[in-house]
Amino acid sequence: MQRRIMGIETEFGVTCTFHGHRRLSPDEVARYLFRRVVSWGRSSNVFLRNGARLYLDVGSHPEYATAECDNLIQLVTHDRAGERVLEDLLIDAEQRLADEGIGGDIYLFKNNTDSAGNSYGCHENYLIVRAGEFSRISDVLLPFLVTRQLICGAGKVLQTPKAATFCLSQRAEHIWEGVSSATTRSRPIINTRDEPHADAEKYRRLHVIVGDSNMCEATTMLKVGTASLVLEMIEAGVPFRDFSLDNPIRAIREVSHDLTGRRPVRLAGGRQASALDIQREYYSRAVEYLQSREPNTQIEQVVDLWGRQLDAVESQDFAKVDTEIDWVIKRKLFQRYQDRYNMELSDPKISQLDLAYHDIKRGRGVFDLLQRKGLAARITTDEEIDAAVTTPPQTTRAKLRGEFISAAQEAGRDFTVDWVHLKLNDQAQRTVLCKDPFRSVDERVKRLIASM
């Protein structure tokens, strides 16, 4: 499948402080954040004009699910648009607090762990054909996903009883199963719950919940681009060496703690391989595969960065990727800070900096400041992101959903939508079922809109 439907769901950490002290509980902050949403959507679970879904998830975490996208830059743009949507809610909520005489600063973090050790996720969705053998896909994909943090981890300072250590991934410590149908209780790497949000006879949705939330656009593109390409190669029957892991859960933690990528992890049958070995195998297959594949500039960019990052890890010289990979950008920032102020990695100020890197408020968040200085690479533009806040992807089913929502809101009509249904809540209860996520034009939807 060379054209694939993809989406990213991001849960955001939330807190409210007043002069540095916590002011409101996460529940209370979430209520202020979503008050404007509830006022027009009558719910804290809504679909937006850009085709995305915005809702309050378990544990008072605002969650943004992008609309269906069918190319990488489109997906990165709509992922960033989610930050803008949440930032707007944050600014509105702070104003409400001020108006009510409460005061306080609200923070939304695009990260995966809080100070209490709780974890929240960044889930990737990839449409795959139903006819494929799912067990083979998960078998080949699992070693790739366990070691992928080497190229696209967000980085984290982990405080251990002995000392603080810098890790590749925020999510690795919180994953407890390889493949499972649960998402919260056991936190698997691949979630098998079969909800295709499409024609179930043709498709299923691969739900990957092991990835970190990325701030850097180039890293997000690398994360989803490599996974999508590996899926495409599996579907095309490309053979891969067997890297079945003896214990994926132990392996994912071992990989996260090894910035050299060289520490051997145990494979099934007693063999060993390093994260670098495993990633090199997938990368070399990708380079080979691209020689016979239809040319695609975005995929070529992904494979180029993949190779440069693996070279950087191998040589431990990150100069050629230090604006493109989140964990590399963050580690360089910490090292400069430590050198300048002569402090240990365990210093609380480094932990504060770690958190501030993920603050989505422009002008305040550390990553935003780095990006403005040209220290973090861009894939999109501010204008494209602003457009994606209100405009759905024009090449997928999201266009139909977005146009329907816009028309219904402008006509003052009551409506209900989900990923596949568009419904006018009138006497006739007219509903259109959109089972094909690739389809951006539908006469039935046009007629439904015209009837308003």
From Swiss-Prot:
Active-site residue list: 57
Key words, A-Z: ATP-binding, Ligase, Magnesium, Metal-binding, Nucleotide-binding, Ubl conjugation, Ubl conjugation pathway
Binding, ATP: 53, 66, 419
Enzyme Commission number(s) from the entry: 6.3.1.19
Gene Ontology terms describing biological process: modification-dependent protein catabolic process; proteasomal protein catabolic process; protein pupylation
Catalytic reaction(s) noted: ATP + [prokaryotic ubiquitin-like protein]-L-glutamate + [protein]-L-lysine = ADP + phosphate + N(6)-([prokaryotic ubiquitin-like protein]-gamma-L-glutamyl)-[protein]-L-lysine
Coiled coil: none
Nucleotide-binding among keywords: yes
PTMs per UniProt: Pupylated at an undetermined lysine residue by the prokaryotic ubiquitin-like protein Pup, which leads to its degradation by the proteasome and thereby constitutes a negative auto-regulation.
One matching Pfam family: Pup_ligase
Binding-site residues, Mg(2+): 9, 55, 63
Pathway: Protein degradation; proteasomal Pup-dependent pathway; Protein modification; protein pupylation
One term of GO molecular function: ubiquitin-like protein transferase activity
Superkingdom, taxonomy of origin: Bacteria
PANTHER family: PUP DEAMIDASE/DEPUPYLASE, PUP--PROTEIN LIGASE
NCBIfam families: pupylate_PafA
Note: The reaction mechanism probably proceeds via the activation of Pup by phosphorylation of its C-terminal glutamate, which is then subject to nucleophilic attack by the substrate lysine, resulting in an isopeptide bond and the release of phosphate as a good leaving group.
Role: Catalyzes the covalent attachment of the prokaryotic ubiquitin-like protein modifier Pup to the proteasomal substrate proteins, thereby targeting them for proteasomal degradation. This tagging system is termed pupylation. The ligation reaction likely involves the side-chain carboxylate of the C-terminal glutamate of Pup and the side-chain amino group of a substrate lysine.
Family: Belongs to the Pup ligase/Pup deamidase family. Pup-conjugating enzyme subfamily.
Protein name per the record: Pup--protein ligase
Organism: Mycolicibacterium smegmatis (strain ATCC 700084 / mc(2)155)
Gene name of the encoded protein: pafA
